[in-house]
Amino acid sequence: MLKEFSTRIIASVCTVMFLFALLMPLSESWGYNVITAGCSSSGGGSIILRTSTILRTEGTNGPDLMLGCNTPDTMYGKSGSDVLQGRSGDDMLYGDSGDDSLQGGEGGDELHAGTGNDIIFAGVDDDFLVAGKGDDELYGEEGNDLLEGGDGADYFDCGDGLDVIVDYDPSKGDTHTNNCEDIRERL
């Protein structure tokens, strides 16, 4: 049942993104637990808005969609196939286990995917990408990025800027494309 609200809401970008949750339970919308830095929601659709700055946000053991704000965010996806978006600010994103997608956005970000077959997008500015275990894809995009694949057959796309791959190993199936500034093979 939909309720009408006559209250004027003034909110940050993070809060506005979740006003749709008043219309349908989040568990029915995408099958993800939706969590933002500074605002969180459970699978049943309740919304908790916090007025203080949140520096650390943790996901659940299921699939999570975690959205950062325009400030430096630290997010931990935990287990499950998670989507973590840092957006603006110098963010630290940790996917942990599962097939995760990490997106840095603007700012100098540090992105750690963990185990699983992950996809990591650096975004804008100078970023550090660490894939970990699994067959991963690392995209340097803009900025001068440092890309570390780890175990598994990894794909590196250096993108714009002067990107460096620090552990390239073609014997385990690593491949690369685009203009990499430097490719250092694992010894």
Feature roles, as predicted:
Residues I35-G38, V83:
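Long, distal/terminal scaffolding or interaction modules
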Residues M1-T7:
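N-terminal secretory signal peptides that target proteins for export/translocation
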Residues D145, L162-D163, Y168-S171:
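Extracellular beta-strand-rich, repetitive "passenger/adhesive" scaffolds
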Residues S12-M24:
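Bacterial N-terminal signal peptides
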Residues L23-T36:
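Sec-dependent signal peptide cleavage junction
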Residues T177-L187:
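Short, low-complexity, Pro/Ser/Thr/Gly-rich segments in the mature regions of secreted, periplasmic
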